[in-house]
């Protein structure tokens, strides 16, 4: 069933996401919407009631801040643990995980399962260069039935695979 809710012309921006990027309907029928330009992920009921906001409107303090997002691009919720995995990659360079009920920060990681480094300089890269040690543009993610998290690093031209703990498994270029 297709539904519509919200009014982007008349509703306050704190209640309705602009620049949506990443949409996921979880196992409890909550609708998660990423707003990459305004650094938030918003959790709605199927009727459009806002029940949780992760991140803060227009506030980003880098890839290692536990409560703020920086350009979220994708959302996936594990139906077994209710953990919310977010690809936070337009301003930040990481995957970040929250509790889906409370919104509490749980963990985050960068490329290869290492801490993200916002100061890394990608410089001029071409297709013959080895993969960078940091994520470039974490553009999306998904979990799968094998218990792994698949992360698309668009500008890094790769997909990295992780355990849900953040431990690196493999990379496909």
Identify the residue ranges that each predicted region occupies.
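Short loop/turn segments that connect beta-strands within beta-propeller blades
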Residues: 45-49, 99-102, 163-167
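Aromatic- and glycine-enriched pocket-lining scaffold segments that form the walls
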Residues: 70-98
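Beta-propeller fold detector
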Residues: 2-7, 51-58, 105-123, 169-173
